[in-house]
From Swiss-Prot:
Catalytic activity as recorded in UniProt: Hydrolysis of proteins to small peptides in the presence of ATP and magnesium. alpha-casein is the usual test substrate. In the absence of ATP, only oligopeptides shorter than five residues are hydrolyzed (such as succinyl-Leu-Tyr-|-NHMec, and Leu-Tyr-Leu-|-Tyr-Trp, in which cleavage of the -Tyr-|-Leu- and -Tyr-|-Trp bonds also occurs)
Record-annotated active site: S93, H118
Gene name, Swiss-Prot/TrEMBL: clpP3
Biological processes, Gene Ontology terms: protein quality control for misfolded or incompletely synthesized proteins
Protein name, UniProt field: ATP-dependent Clp protease proteolytic subunit 3
Biological source species: Rhodococcus jostii (strain RHA1)
Molecular function terms from GO: ATP-dependent peptidase activity; ATPase binding; serine-type endopeptidase activity
Length: 202
């Protein structure tokens, strides 16, 4: 594909298109509805095109909407492909949840990435009844996030609840030791094989 073939696309769109063709999705910035729509659509399209080859998610995100993040999480689990997750720079809050929710054995951090885990938060206001309803919903989201992290890291829910009660920061090595990622890499060659089409024949 050439730039001339897509005159209405800007550089970022062209870059995203090239990455998509390499079965690579970038999750950068706040996790919101726009990110969820794009990521879920691309995951489904890539799975439909080839249900066996890996899909790679590079994550550089401070987190954001729990609902948007859970939409991406559910789609990652829905597709039959292995999903390689790569922490690139900063993966916090819902970004950290998505990072550790990749296919086990294929959750990766770059050497100087920072990862942060904490409990979900949200602004609460309105009448007393509204506040009670919102508080119940927030508590349910918190428990759901803790159960996901427990399943992905192998730690008991009670330990996840304790460890995420306040912001907890991890270096790449600490995240590996905790079970958030499986490997810390410093070479693209350690990630690139996941995006390479299988060879047929000799």
């Amino acid at each position: 594909m050439t730039t001339a073939a897509l005159p209405d696309l800007n550089y970022r769109d062209l870059l995203a298109d090239r990455l998509f063709r390499q079965r690579t999705i970038l999750l950068t910035g706040e996790v919101d509805d726009a990110m969820a729509e794009r990521a879920c659509s691309e995951l489904v399209l890539l799975a439909a095109a080839d249900p066996k080859r890996d899909i790679v998610l590079y994550i550089n995100s401070p987190g954001g909407s729990v609902f948007a993040g859970l939409a991406i999480y559910d789609t990652m689990k829905l597709v039959p492909n292995d999903v390689v997750t790569v922490a690139m720079g900063f993966a916090a809050s819902m970004g950290q949840v998505l990072l550790c929710s990749g296919t086990h054995g294929k959750r990766i951090s770059l050497a100087h990435s920072r990862i942060m885990m904490h409990q979900p938060s949200a602004g609460i206001g309105g009448t007393a009844v509204d506040i009670a309803i919102q508080a119940e919903s927030l508590e349910r989201m918190k428990r759901q996030s803790q159960e996901i992290l427990a399943a992905e890291t192998g730690h008991p829910v009670e330990q996840i609840a304790e460890d995420s009660d306040r912001d907890r920061w991890f270096t790449a090595d600490e995240a590996r030791d905790y079970g958030i990622v499986d490997r810390v890499v410093s070479s693209f060659a350690e990630i690139a094989p996941h995006t390479t089409a299988p060879r047929i024949g000799l």
